[in-house]
């Protein structure tokens, strides 16, 4: 990650500030020196005339801000560049993006998102380069569409600078370095079997079911999943009267593999969300009580409280 000028792919720090962003960010000093940051900027949310109840502050990035805790620097500014004024709001809004980050759709996803959700402490706001936004969008939106999401208006790339100092990861012409080492597996089926990751998927989903599957067939470019037995863990938008005739869809999944569906003799943990009239599968795991991580998930699920703010995607 670095601060660069987007024109001609040049990178550099044209800022007379001191801040350490680690080896990946151009060296500019220690963030711990800043307890208060006063932004004098003519771009972004500070131009909007919005009244903030508190002046901008430089604060520690908390461990439970999972999206940005390991981004490479330790302090961030509040309000952030998405106009979130409190850490509670930042954590709740950022949690929507953690499952996407885990999909590794682009090498610059975390750098791009954290430059907005958890901007580094400088004497004025520095936005991500437009080309970085476009590269992340072009790589990640196809993955998002498997989950029924599109690139949100709040991250529209033409809002970000082209010819000014901006947050960069690699030069714009180094596209080969930013391409993900991806897989052909349907993204909702490509899940890490870690209790924390399952909890994150649960919170990002609207409903969760323990399910036995009757059959899977292709329909209009999707995989259509017909349940045999189901027990709700989290109903969300599903009405009890509709459970009997519930059908799920793996969006755009007709031709990508989902290895969990190769053997339907198991019970599954199915998570999803409703998009228009369809119930979309957003994550699937074999229901395996013998697995240590799955057992941990079951314990955590009983007491875990998911974020309550409305999703940034809606």
Curated annotation (Swiss-Prot):
Tissue: Widely expressed. Absent from lung, liver and peripheral blood leukocytes. Highest levels in heart and fetal kidney. Also expressed in testis, ovary, fetal brain and lung, leiomyomal cells, myometrial cells and vascular smooth muscle cells. Expressed in foreskin fibroblasts and in keratinocytes.
Induction: Down-regulated in colorectal and breast tumors. Up-regulated in uterine leiomyomas under high estrogenic conditions. Expression, in leiomyomal cells, also increased both under hypoxic and serum deprivation conditions.
One MF term in the entry's GO annotations: heparin binding
Signal peptide start-end: 1-31
One BP term from GO: cellular response to starvation
Cross-referenced InterPro entries: Frizzled/SFRP (IPR015526), Frizzled_dom (IPR020067), Frizzled_dom_sf (IPR036790), Netrin_domain (IPR001134), Netrin_module_non-TIMP (IPR018933), SFRP1_CRD (IPR041760), TIMP-like_OB-fold (IPR008993)
Superkingdom of origin: Eukaryota
Glycosylation site positions: 173
SUPFAM superfamilies per the UniProt record, alphabetical: Frizzled cysteine-rich domain, TIMP-like
FZ domain: residues covered: 53-169
UniProt keyword annotation of S-adenosyl-L-methionine present: no
Subcellular location: Secreted
Keywords in alphabetical order: Developmental protein, Differentiation, Disulfide bond, Glycoprotein, Secreted, Signal, Wnt signaling pathway
GO terms under cellular component: cell surface; collagen-containing extracellular matrix; cytosol; extracellular exosome; extracellular region; extracellular space; plasma membrane
Predominant location category: secreted
Disulfide-bonded cysteines: 58-121, 68-114, 105-140, 129-166, 133-157, 186-256, 189-258, 203-306
Entry's free-text remark on domains: The FZ domain is involved in binding with Wnt ligands.
PANTHER family associated with the record: FRIZZLED, SECRETED FRIZZLED-RELATED PROTEIN 1
Subunit structure: Interacts with WNT1, WNT2 and FRZD6. Interacts with WNT4, WNT8 and MYOC.
Family: Belongs to the secreted frizzled-related protein (sFRP) family.
Protein name: Secreted frizzled-related protein 1
Native source organism of the sequence: Homo sapiens
Originating gene: SFRP1
